[in-house]
Amino acid sequence: MTAPAPPSAAASDAGAPPAFAPYVPDRESPRELTLRAVLLGTVLGIVFGASSLYLFLKVGMTVSASIPVAVLAITIFRALSGAIGSPRATILENNVVQTAGSAGESIAFGVGATMPALMILGYDMDPLRVMLVSILGGILGILMMIPLRRAFIVKQHGTLPYPEGTACAKILIAGEQGGSSARTVFTGFGVAFVYQVLMEAMKLWSKEPAKLITGIKGYDKAVIATEASPTLLGVGYIIGLRTASVMVGGGILASLVLIPAIAYFGQGFTTPLAPATSALIRDMGPDEIRGTYVRYIGAGAVAAGGIISMCRALPLIVASLVGGLRSMRGNGGLQVDMSGRTERDMPISVVILGSLALVGAIAATGLIPTNAVGRVVGAGMILLFGFLFVTVSSRLTGEIGSSSNPISGMTIATLLLTCLIFYMLGWVGVEYRVAALSIAAIVCIASSNGGTTSQDLKTGFLVGATPRAQQWAIIVGAITSAVVIGFTLLLLNNVYTDVTDKPEYLPRMSAPAEAIADAPTATGPDGKTYRVWWVNKGSDLAQPGKYLVDETGKPAYRIDPGINGVVKTRADGSEATKFTPPQPALFAVIIDGILTGELPWVLVVLGAFLAIVIQLAGVSALAFAVGVYLPLATTLPIFLGGIIRGFVDRRHRMTAEESDSSPAILYSSGLIAGGSIAGILMAVREVWPWLKRTLDLSPYLPAGWSERPGPAVIAFGLLALTLLWTGLRAKPAVAAVGSIDGNGSAAR
């Protein structure tokens, strides 16, 4: 198909859309929104949504699932066609699959970033709340983005590149020629899955080899460790050497500078240094120092980094909002042209009424647990902040891509504004903390899914899809993914929850009689029945959390959650597995700091100024801050993946576009998915102790083998070599196939 000539200046000035010829012409109507496409898309969305949630809980970030989902759709349909003789899938069916399948990753980010903060504040993570927030936020983001499609996708085609959406369109067009790319994804998935099972279930080598630095007087609490994880290795390759280097720099500062410095200067203290309440610094290990002091420094740095990234994008944010509102007032917004197939959006009446119905449901279902006035105010803030940040997110993903979209910064802004409004209204009671978090969670999920929806609609615009079909597909994908992601979050938290009776984790005072009079009961590890005592943030009775107390109120056990928990060692002496994403802790700090005023502000401010210094030095403050918050063991394997990508890119002299579509990127996507799914299954294994004991081969190995660093380093090195070999053996072919020409027209 011959590309049309560029539009004239007059046409451009008149606001007419640029001349564009998609891959599938408007006059053709191939199969698109079919049952098989929607079913496959929802299944892949569930798989990648669950794996994205696991990844987020590990490192506080996710990676786009659109490209691997598109590749898998092409190959699976091709295989089914050959095996059972079903009709070959059209490119538009494949596009529906990737559209429905992409919702899981964006919802996973929003849910993982916000919902665990409930437990840090001292509340239970109610399953119904998690499900409703996930579903309502996901659908709201889609509906609010639909009126912006013509403004951002059509009228600004050629101005807003939408990098991931354009790359996915190239994958779909290239998929008409073969399926070798999918084999690369499946290979990475299989390698990572087997590796994770051998390491975590069979315990053939250590999951986290570590070395305590010794030999320097006074420098005795610095630990170099790495998590031998295929998931983190894949993440490092995808985000690249620059970002991976910045993250590991933050990890080095925290583990090899801040922790040893605090230990050195605090070794002479004879009283606890706040926020510690009982332990002396000289008696703390590296993990305790991190949890007591460095965690708040990291939270302050993450908050400042998120705000900085949002401020840097402020001109784009203002332009996005003004442009979106202007376009909706003109012929590009509410008056949708229904004459052509590729212009058919979901009816605007459905969008408006659906958005209002969702907000009404939020106010009516008790998601905002306040009085009637508080619910109405909260629903209004969701509507206002939701549309604001969905507009911002949709525009920014077009400008800088999903990976650089500052969703965390938008959520911080929402939470700050919400808490300040509550504070000015005098709403500082216990219920308003949950209300503030619920508002921020819905806005976070909506803005995240709004950005993903815009990328999907860009892909559809390039390949010639029907927008309405895509919009229904991603709504179905959002609902199914949200339900599974909610269950996955609860599963991962519950199976890694620990019950401890160690005195250092228990309150020194008894629970008030009125606090446990009507409390539910639970059975403790000793078989006795106890009352459940929830201690919320702001209480001076005990650290926030869940406790089991006897009838007199005396604490007997602490129920420590699997996400952002504080217990490091189980009762049997084994290491407790915990997820420590930075965002939930940060959001809890913001709510606690504004509504209760009780916060170690000195440490938070130190972290904020640290982020400012890093930004002034020309380095991404947010990536560095995440590195400060996460353990060095998490950022080191990410750094190794980044080093491998840097070497491969230099060896092949690839452009950024070629590198982003290379075989090693697809292999890394497989590593992430395979390692994450295996990790989720390892969590399920905790439910059946007999299965856990059966798979454990460490008793048959030499004494101490599974704890030695050597076997883990060798195994992880071999895994890294498979990634290096994949990157070196072939240059990408995708970028050259089905390319988008200078006018943005798809060459067919």
Question: What are the residue ranges of the model-derived segments?
Answer:
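Alpha-helical multipass membrane-protein architecture
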Residues: M1-R748
